[in-house]
Amino acid sequence: MIPQVVTNETITTISPNGINFPQKDESQPTQQRQDSLKKHLKAEIKVIVAIQIMCAVTVLALGIILASVPPVPYFNSVFSVLLKSGYPFIGALFFIASGILSIITERKSTKPLVDASLTLNILSVSFAFVGIIIISVSLAGLHPASEQCKQSKELSLIEHDYYQPFYNSDRSECAVTKSILTGALSVMLIISVLELGLALLSAMLWLREGVLTSLRM
């Protein structure tokens, strides 16, 4: 009869050829860790995608509003660069597309889809960065445009010898226009900064998912 030594519920068998230790299956804990990381990744992606799409819709809506307003003297040149760049439209569509593709990839994680999501998010980072620069330049140009508007109103009033009440009304018109544009562009700038952060985070998550997918293959 072969003697057995029992220690901590682990059976060690002593045979004439030596001591045989039982081999532990290390693949199961590794698989559990990968499954846990995958579940955590899916939860993070759902939250990021929801915020990303809402921000993109807001940028698109603000772009449509700015494009549909009637010509505003002295202020048109300020935000026309933003509209001509196409950022409120093309950038927003890229953000929405990357969000939708992230949802599809989260449900069916394959290497081509993961690579496509990573590429779209990298492009979204580029668009957000360019958008932040353009919006910042537009915001900086609002004050000079407002001053030109006020000076033009003053000259017009002097030439036509208008009364003081009309003068105050025209000056307030310039101030109100500046305030509205400042608010709209500031909201777009904040959302663009948020989109930049979300796109960077999404790119990092999909990069990690790509590594995990390669390990499983």
Curated annotation (Swiss-Prot):
Segments for region (Disordered): 1-33
Membrane topology reported for the UniProt record: Multi-pass membrane protein
Stated name of the protein: Membrane-spanning 4-domains subfamily A member 6C
UniProtKB keywords: Membrane, Receptor, Transmembrane, Transmembrane helix
Known tissue expression: Expressed only by thymus, spleen, peripheral lymph node and bone marrow.
UniProt-listed InterPro entries: CD20-like, MS4A
Gene: Ms4a6c
Superkingdom classification of source: Eukaryota
Highest classification ranks of the organism: Eukaryota, Metazoa, Chordata, Craniata, Vertebrata
One Gene Ontology term, aspect cellular component: membrane
Residue ranges of the TM segments: 47-67, 85-105, 122-142, 187-207
Positions in the Cytoplasmic compartment: 1-46, 106-121, 208-217
Organism the protein comes from: Mus musculus
Compartments (UniProt record): Membrane
